[in-house]
Amino acid sequence: MESRGKSASSPKPDTKVPQATAEAKATPAADGKAPLTKPVKKDTQAEKQEQAAAPGPAATKKTPAKADPVLLNNHSNLKPAPTVPAAPSSPDATSEPKGPGDGAEEDESNTGGRGPWPCENLTPLLVAGGVAVATIALILGVAFLARKK
């Protein structure tokens, strides 16, 4: 069952099988026995077909490498910020003062660049601590119940 699963999931084991058969057929010919010309030709044709098929996937593998590294390294769930032109098109847009109803205070509070919780690095520690406390509580509870019986 495992060999079927592996061959169905990846084509690499299939490409190695004809090479192994070609080596097995070539060794009897090297031992001094009569060489079989027809199977060798079939093997070489199969190898040529494999080599012809190999550049196709290699070309498709090169296209993801051309992707923008900034996009590949972006692991945040936040949407990208809209790009703002360096020079505004109209001077009236920049001269408008922001009042209390315009959300000026909200914009100033978000300039720190922090997420919803400033101590994001403590999250794994808190999870591990919670697991440890739960484990201790479970052990003590089982020990207490076993002692009562």
UniProtKB/Swiss-Prot annotation:
UniProt membrane topology term: Single-pass type IV membrane protein
Compartments, record wording: Membrane
Keyword terms of this UniProt record: Differentiation, Membrane, Phosphoprotein, Transmembrane, Transmembrane helix
Expressed in which tissues: Expressed in the brain, including hypothalamus, brainstem, and hippocampus. Expression is high in 1-month-old mouse brain and then declines in mature mouse brains at the age of 3 and 7 months.
Biased segments, Low complexity type: 20-35, 51-68, 80-97
Transmembrane feature ranges: 125-145
Biological role stated in the UniProt entry: Involved in neuronal differentiation.
Protein name: Cell cycle exit and neuronal differentiation protein 1
Species for this entry: Mus musculus (Mouse)
Gene name of the record: Cend1
